[in-house]
Regions:
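Active-site acidic catalytic loop and adjacent metal/ATP-binding pocket
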Residues: 2-3, 46-94, 104
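Active-site activation/catalytic loop segments of kinase-like enzymes and analogous catalytic loops
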Residues: 26-35, 90-128, 142-162
Length: 169
């Protein structure tokens, strides 16, 4: 089992720390809000960074979306692109997949899948998952906001600097 083979992710992987979050969010500031000062930007987004830092942490692929999933010849799911893996918010990969930049999913389906994921964590004996559904959904939305701000910054950088506008579609 993949999860069991990880051992202690916290000891083996870099942590998705506040400073790492700021590094990623700065991509958004630099490429989407170049006239906003770093001080003003940090003042605006500090509550997001602090809130994300409080979400329980687990192994985080960090680039878990449809283009990194493969159907292997054995009809098993293959996952690629692990080089960015970290120890971070438990909902980060879930939101990366369910609110994938390349696929539009129905909100009702997303809500059901988030609830199902939370129940699986509870069934696995993970005490931190025993929070109100609204709180778990809040963790999901916060991680999604941070991730998508980073993605918007990266996609805008690809458009402006690298002349690759297709990512913005």
């Amino acid at each position: 089992n993949f999860q069991n083979s990880l051992g202690s992710a916290e000891e083996k992987l870099p942590t998705f720390s506040k400073s790492w979050q700021w590094k990623e969010l700065d991509i958004f500031r630099e490429w989407c809000l170049p006239d906003v000062s770093n001080e003003e930007f940090q003042e605006t987004f500090n509550a997001l960074v602090v809130s994300i830092d409080q979400i329980p942490k687990a192994f985080m692929h960090r680039d878990f979306h449809c283009r990194n999933l493969l159907l292997c010849s054995s009809n098993e799911l293959g996952v690629i692109d692990f080089q960015g893996a970290m120890f971070g918010p438990v909902t980060y990969d879930l939101v990366s997949l369910l609110r994938d930049c390349y696929v539009e999913n129905e909100e009702d389906w997303i809500s059901r899948e988030v609830a199902s994921f939370q129940q699986k964590l509870i069934s696995a004996g993970l005490a931190f998952a025993k929070v109100e559904t609204e709180e778990f959904m809040r963790w999901f939305d916060l991680a999604g906001l941070q991730r998508h701000l980073k993605c918007i910054g990266i996609f805008n950088r690809l458009k402006i600097r690298d002349n690759k506008p297709d990512y913005m579609n």
